[in-house]
Amino acid sequence: MIGKLKGVIDEIAEDHAVIDVHGVGYVAFCSARTLGNLGGVGEAAILFIETYVREDMIRLYGFANQLEREWFRLLQNVQGVGAKVALAVLGTLSPSELANAIALRDIAMVSRAPGVGKKVAERIVTELKNKAPAFAGDASGTIGLKQELGAGAAPAPVADAVSALSNLGYSRDQAANAVAAALKEAGENADSAKLIRLGLKELSR
């Protein structure tokens, strides 16, 4: 089994990269995000690898870090999600953004990924809602909201407040942290307008 490749980029295509390791070219299928951040031909590269072995083929999937690889594995536990769909999701959302989307039941955000319809996005959010915190990475805002709301899904005012703050230019983590602080002050029954107002107050400190 191959767990990591360290070599020189020989080729970058639409859905894969070829990494030259001591004269041997390894084809690794990657998300669009990973390919975009990989660098140019001739540059050094490191990819964390998930190896799939079938009777008729061996396929390598490459990731920028181990967290992205863990999300790739986790996503495929969802019914209807294979390697191609998992890569599409990770190409659209970073691990932190995906953790936030699942915690906040933001189906629209997950369905932004190519080939991911509303039903698949709903399954991802529903089936992974209790597993996502362990894979949240740097999504501290998500963790804060989870602590405030418990294991259940975020109510609509919370999701609306996070979305509104994000639309104002704040990152999803900043927005989630601010809304978590607002919830502490206003309580779980606060409407979105109050959460946005208190969230902005928190962000201005």
Swiss-Prot record:
GO molecular function: ATP binding; four-way junction DNA binding; four-way junction helicase activity
Entry domain remark: Has three domains with a flexible linker between the domains II and III and assumes an 'L' shape. Domain III is highly mobile and contacts RuvB.
Matches recorded under Pfam families: HHH_5, RuvA_C, RuvA_N
Domain III, as annotated region: 153-205
GO cellular component, as recorded: cytoplasm; Holliday junction helicase complex; Holliday junction resolvase complex
Name of the gene: ruvA
Principal subcellular localisation of the protein: cytoplasm
Region (Domain I) location: 1-64
GO biological process, one term: DNA repair
Keyword DNA-binding: yes
Family: Belongs to the RuvA family.
Region entry Domain II, spans: 65-143
UniProt keyword annotations, A-Z: Cytoplasm, DNA damage, DNA recombination, DNA repair, DNA-binding
Role of this protein: The RuvA-RuvB-RuvC complex processes Holliday junction (HJ) DNA during genetic recombination and DNA repair, while the RuvA-RuvB complex plays an important role in the rescue of blocked DNA replication forks via replication fork reversal (RFR). RuvA specifically binds to HJ cruciform DNA, conferring on it an open structure. The RuvB hexamer acts as an ATP-dependent pump, pulling dsDNA into and through the RuvAB complex. HJ branch migration allows RuvC to scan DNA until it finds its consensus sequence, where it cleaves and resolves the cruciform DNA.
Lineage of origin: Bacteria, Pseudomonadati, Pseudomonadota, Alphaproteobacteria, Hyphomicrobiales
Oligomer status and interactors: Homotetramer. Forms an RuvA(8)-RuvB(12)-Holliday junction (HJ) complex. HJ DNA is sandwiched between 2 RuvA tetramers; dsDNA enters through RuvA and exits via RuvB. An RuvB hexamer assembles on each DNA strand where it exits the tetramer. Each RuvB hexamer is contacted by two RuvA subunits (via domain III) on 2 adjacent RuvB subunits; this complex drives branch migration. In the full resolvosome a probable DNA-RuvA(4)-RuvB(12)-RuvC(2) complex forms which resolves the HJ.
Localisation: Cytoplasm
Protein name (record): Holliday junction branch migration complex subunit RuvA
Species of the source: Brucella anthropi (strain ATCC 49188 / DSM 6882 / CCUG 24695 / JCM 21032 / LMG 3331 / NBRC 15819 / NCTC 12168 / Alc 37)
Region (Flexible linker): 144-152
